[in-house]
Every structure is written in structure tokens, then in C-alpha cells.
Amino acid sequence: MDLIEDVKAALRASRRGATVLNLGVFDTFPELAGRLFAQISGNVAVGSTVQSVYAADATLVEITTYDIAETARRNFEPGGAAATLLFARGAHAVMAHRVAHKIWADGDTTLALAIKTSCARVLSNDIHPAAKIGAGFWLDHGLGFVAGETSVIEEDVSIWHNVTLGSTLNTGGAVAIRTLAQAL
């Protein structure tokens, strides 16, 4: 079974849960991601943007599904990748960032910041759209996580919460930590 079929099976197993999530009908990852983010953000335009960005970039879908698989593998919660996609706040934050980063890289910085801000309000983290994050990133709950514009997180990195990258909170002296490597 693939991720979409696993999510459908989980929703069929709990009609009340499916009603609360209110995701409707979906057949592809971009459709599911769009519906999920419309619910998370409370904004249909955010969901539509998420769906269109994923629909236009198969590599982004591949990286995101790898993030989800790695989160499910490293996390201690039951339910596998389907539950991770539906319920993991950290995975949602990484997905929102990946969409905002793609939009930023394509030159629409206002839309990228709007997506970032809309999602950050409900996910309790702040990841600048210019921050570079490698595949396989596991952000546990993501609460209090901040990554500044110059942050670089390499592949297969795990972070729990209350971490700030890219600031020293002063005007001189210490150098900000901006890059996290796999071994950390």
C-alpha cells in the first residue's frame, strides 16, 4: 500500500475521525496535502496553494514523503506514515516550509512569507522560507523551533523543540549556529 491508500484506510477505520478531519475526497498526495493545509490553516487559499505547488513538483512530493517516512520511523507514536501525515505537527511544519521555500525560490517572496506566517500561527514555529532543509528532516512537535533566513539543515537531521538557528541575539561577538549536519 502507498501513503495515500494508507491514509484512506485510516480514515475508513474511523468515520468519526474522518468527519472531524473533514478532508473530503482525494486521490493524490497534492490533493490530500491541499485539503489538509486548508484545515490546518483555516484558509482555503493556503490549501489551494499547497496543492498547486505539490502538483507542479514531483521531486518536492518525493522529498516530503521521505520526510514523512523518516518521521514515522524515528517517532515513538503509533500509526506509521499515515498517522504522521495526518497528525504530526512537526511534519506539517516541514511540509509548510517546503512549499514556502519552493515559492521563495521561484521569486514570489510575499506569497512564501504569507504561507509561512499562516502556518506558523497554528504550528507554533517559525521557519524562514529561505532556510535550506535537506530531505529526511524530522522535526518532532516543532514547538518553539525557529530557523532564520541563512539556516542550513543537512539531510537526515532530527530536532525536537525549542531550538533556534541563525541568531545570536546580539550585535557582535558570537557567531550564530546556522548549519546542522546529520551527526547532530
Residue ranges and their predicted role:
Residues 1-118:
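Terminal amphipathic alpha-helical/low-complexity segments used for targeting or macromolecular assembly
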Residues 101-184:
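Flexible, glycine/small-residue-enriched loop-and-beta-strand segment within the central core
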